[in-house]
Amino acid sequence: QGEAGIGLFLLDANSDGVARQWLPTMDQARKQAALQLRDVSVPGTDLMGEAGQAWPALSTVLDLAAVALAAEQVGGCQQLLDMTVEYTGERVQFNRTIASFQAVKHKAADMMLQTEVARSAIYYAACVAQETLEGGPLAGELAEASSVAKSYCSDAYFAVAGDSLQLFGGVGFTWEYDVHLYFKRAKSSEHMLGNGSVHRERLAATLLD
């Protein structure tokens, strides 16, 4: 970022002064690294677009990425719901499957409700994202749609993962089942590209402006 604003440059990852540092993560299935730049010089010919005019494009890319991540979160919700329904239908306690207990049914119903609402949010956000890429009439609503989807889907994914872990019980923490992997993914993806609080504040600022 310079006096003219934010600029976007092409940078060879093997350039002098560029280093990548591996970061330990809660979600072991999603690798992350910190990019360190020390005294790195980039020629003006590697500038993408006009100097200081990169933020609109970067903002759009971040919104599109948030929509994509929210879609992944909805997929995680559905998978957790499916696994939980299957497990509770097989797990027997007191000579009956635990799925037959009303409290378990209520918990599963709550999981389904949050999953379906999250699905509705991502369907709309995906539609707006497509319109943005095609220059359609909804292109101007990408920021709002992405924040709605990311905020709700983040909260729903973590809540559904927590409920699933509760219904699986202690076995959900073992490597024999994938529930704990989804729980870790839910928590890590919640904070990636902004958590629910960040996006709700952004949405409120946009709507009240």
Residue locations for each model-derived region?
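Internal glycine-rich alpha/beta core junctions
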Residues: 12-14, 25-61, 82, 196, ...
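Alpha-helical interface subdomain recognition
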Residues: 60-209
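Short, glycine- and charge-enriched coil/turn segments that flank and shape catalytic ligand pockets
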Residues: 2-5, 43-53, 130-140
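Short helix/loop capping segments that flank catalytic or ligand/cofactor-binding pockets
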Residues: 19-20, 45-46, 78
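A short core secondary-structure module
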Residues: 1-19
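A generic local secondary-structure boundary/capping motif
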Residues: 1, 22-27
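Residue-level signal for inorganic ion chemistry
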Residues: 9, 35-37, 77, 118
